[in-house]
UniProtKB/Swiss-Prot annotation:
All residue ranges annotated as the Phosducin domain in the record: 27-181
Residue numbers spanned by region Thioredoxin fold: 92-240
GO CC annotation, single: nucleoplasm
Organism this protein belongs to: Mus musculus (Mouse)
GO biological process: actin cytoskeleton organization; angiogenesis; apoptotic process; chaperone-mediated protein folding; negative regulation of chaperone-mediated protein folding; negative regulation of ubiquitin-dependent protein catabolic process; positive regulation of angiogenesis; positive regulation of endothelial cell proliferation
Expression by tissue: Expressed in blood vessels (at protein level).
PTM summary: N-terminal methionine acetylation destabilizes the protein.
Gene3D superfamilies in the record: Glutaredoxin
Domain of life of the organism encoding this protein: Eukaryota
The protein's name in its UniProt record: Phosducin-like protein 3
Pfam families given in the database record: Phosducin
Keywords, comma-separated and alphabetical: Acetylation, Angiogenesis, Apoptosis, Chaperone, Cytoplasm, Endoplasmic reticulum, Phosphoprotein
Length: 240
């Protein structure tokens, strides 16, 4: 097949007839086509190392060009940052027992942007045991939140038992919420969902619950309190 780019009399005739594009236009088309092919090639390479693990990037780094290696290094750093963020986010998952001497390190210096939930309790108080049980479940559900517990008097000397259970919510060492005493928790009927909702109101955890699970009971109580006062019957008046 004759080369359409060749400077021949026949090609000149074809160009004049409009059968072949002008020579300059043809060159531009070729350059555009070459650029597209290069872009597709680069995208293919990018897709290749986007799908690779950090270990695979290390194994295959000799196969890439200098330009590819710069892009790969950017992806490697991005992957590493994502991995570290995931490890940090999921590094808890259980309730840690501390004493007073651990307070500064575990609470005040817990870390930037980190939520800490501290339960002050004592053995032998049933509601404290119930809350510890619920917190264990919530710690597994929200591994990015630091859940800790401590016997009350090891953190606060002479802390009165009547204030137990007590839950403090911290962020970056500052108290964001506090729940003190059995009445705040509603007694032994407290469910894990109710505790989750209560803690979510402080901002410490991001619950998927759409409404307070205790609300229907509260509405029922309120409706009974707000209900109409029954009218006295005439017979009641006569009996007085």
């Amino acid at each position: 097949m004759q080369d359409p780019n060749a400077d021949t009399e026949w090609n000149d005739i074809l160009r004049k007839k409009g059968i072949l594009p002008p020579k300059e236009s043809l060159k531009e088309l070729e350059e555009e086509e070459a650029e597209k092919e290069e872009q597709l090639l680069q995208q293919s390479v990018v897709k290749t190392y986007e799908d690779m693990t950090l270990e695979e990037l290390e194994e295959n780094e000799d196969e890439f060009s200098e330009e590819d290696e710069r892009a790969i290094e950017m992806y490697r750093q991005q992957r590493l940052a994502e991995w570290k963020a995931t490890q940090l986010k999921n590094k808890f998952g259980e309730v840690l027992e501390i004493s007073g001497k651990d307070y500064v390190q575990e609470v005040t210096k817990a870390g930037e942007g980190l939520w800490v939930i501290l339960h002050l309790y004592k053995q032998g108080i049933p509601l404290c045991s119930l809350i510890n049980h619920h917190l264990s479940g919530l710690a597994r559900k929200f591994p990015d939140v630091k859940f800790i517990k401590a016997i009350s008097t090891t953190c606060i000397p002479n802390y009165p038992d009547r204030n137990l259970p007590t839950v403090f919510v911290y962020r970056e060492g500052d108290i964001k919420a506090q729940f003190i005493g059995p009445l705040v928790f509603g007694g032994m009927n407290l469910t894990i969902d109710e505790l989750e909702w209560k803690l979510s109101e402080s901002g410490a955890i991001k619950t998927a619950l759409e409404e307070n699970p205790k609300k229907p009971i509260q509405d029922l109580l309120l409706s009974s309190v707000r209900g109409p006062v029954p009218m006295r019957r005439d017979s009641d008046s006569e009996d007085d």
